[in-house]
């Protein structure tokens, strides 16, 4: 199960505007915050992690990502109705541009989510937009306009440092931070239980994962797994959930997705619009799931059934039985996902 659930979160009113230069002066690297880890604290060589120091340093770099999604229910008689549900996850502040604060999270935390809000450590919130995502790696980058962040909030924000995770050892102590159950950030501890693990979620197989016994719950998706120096070594995203199973949570190592994150950070921010203003592609298509793909030897993607005459798809040269596997350098696996991108 994904660690990001459709759980009620709590949002507060948006922050007021702030001068960009003020944000630049106030936002600092986690490893350099005054209240956190100092040069005199040799945590890396300590036999016991200073969890309080790590949490103090990292919490200002963590955000809640809350929004809404449309859920379709079904009944015994075949009739169903749609209703709006709340969704909660976690994000990690990893950088900023001249105009935006940049946040890394899981793709499933922000995919098909409306009214996306970012809640900072001081409780203030701001509208959040998606810059891009890589669904087959479950990684996304979102952005908040610096003009939507007050100077007070900016002074409490930190930027997390992404650490090379290739030298992580089994048994190494770690700290996990995330918006568990949509109730705000919480801190848990554990160790690296295993490396290079694979799991399948919603017919997509993820490989090269870290397994940890640190408690990871719904809402923790997109949160940080930190080493003793307060640096992000992995991004929490899933856990094994069944009777008799405990302590099997999974995180995506930073080293596996650093290039993807860097690429997504440079993309143009996408502001979601109403369906009547969305771009029209002009195709009817069906999803090729991983099961169908493996059986027929097709790639996972969208199989075009028809192309409307004189549509954008027609003008671009798309034809019946073509398979769409990507859009704007992003992986496409479902028609609904493509529609959401448009």
Where does each model-flagged region fall?
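Terminal peptide-recognition signature
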Residues: 60-65, 91, 101, 105, ...
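N-terminal activation segment of mature serine protease catalytic domains
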Residues: 2-79, 85-90, 114-115, 169, ...
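Conserved active-site neighborhood of the chymotrypsin/trypsin-like protease fold
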Residues: 95-185, 332-333
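Extracytoplasmic/secreted envelope proteins and their assembly/folding machinery
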Residues: 51-62, 88-90, 139, 168, ...
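C-terminal recognition in membrane/secretory proteostasis and scaffolding
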Residues: 1-25, 107, 129-130, 227-233, ...
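Short, conserved beta-turn/loop elements at beta-strand boundaries and strand-helix junctions
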Residues: 68-71, 96-98, 112, 133-137, ...
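Active-site loop architecture of trypsin-fold serine endopeptidases
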Residues: 72-73, 80, 84-85, 113-116, ...
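A conserved glycine-rich beta-strand in the N-terminal activation segment of trypsin-fold
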Residues: 44-53, 72-102, 124-129, 159-161, ...
């Amino acid at each position: 199960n994904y660690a990001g659930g459709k759980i009620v979160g709590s949002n507060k009113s948006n922050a007021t505007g702030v001068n960009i230069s003020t944000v630049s002066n106030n936002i600092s690297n986690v490893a350099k915050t005054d209240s956190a880890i100092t040069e005199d604290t040799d945590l890396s060589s300590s036999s016991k992690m200073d969890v309080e120091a790590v949490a103090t340093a990292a919490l200002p770099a963590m955000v809640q990502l809350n929004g809404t999604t449309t859920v379709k229910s079904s009944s015994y008689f075949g009739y169903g109705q749609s209703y709006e549900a709340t969704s909660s996850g976690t994000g990690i502040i990893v950088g900023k541009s001249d105009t935006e604060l940049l946040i890394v999270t899981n793709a499933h935390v922000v995919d098909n989510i409306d009214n996306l809000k970012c809640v900072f450590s001081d409780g203030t919130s701001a509208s959040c937009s998606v810059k891009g995502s890589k669904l087959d790696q479950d990684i996304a980058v979102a952005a908040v306009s610096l003009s939507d962040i007050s100077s007070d909030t900016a002074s409490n924000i930190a930027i997390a440092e992404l650490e090379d995770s290739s030298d992580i050892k089994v048994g190494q102590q770690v700290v996990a931070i995330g918006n568990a159950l949509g109730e705000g950030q919480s801190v848990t501890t554990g160790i690296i239980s295993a490396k290079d693990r694979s799991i399948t979620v919603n017919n997509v197989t993820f490989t090269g994962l870290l397994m940890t016994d640190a408690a990871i719950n719904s809402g923790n998706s997109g949160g940080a797994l930190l080493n003793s120096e307060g640096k992000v070594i992995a991004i929490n995203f899933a856990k094994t959930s069944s009777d008799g199973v405990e302590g099997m949570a999974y995180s995506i190592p930073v080293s596996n997705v650093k290039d993807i994150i860097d690429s997504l950070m440079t993309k143009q921010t996408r502001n979601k619009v109403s369906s009547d203003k969305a771009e029209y592609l002009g195709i009817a298509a069906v999803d090729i799931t991983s099961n169908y793909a493996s059986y027929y030897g097709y790639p996972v993607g969208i199989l075009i059934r028809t192309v409307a005459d004189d549509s954008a798809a027609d003008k671009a040269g798309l034809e019946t039985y073509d398979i769409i596997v990507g859009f704007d350098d992003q992986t496409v696996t479902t028609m609904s996902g493509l529609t959401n991108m448009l």
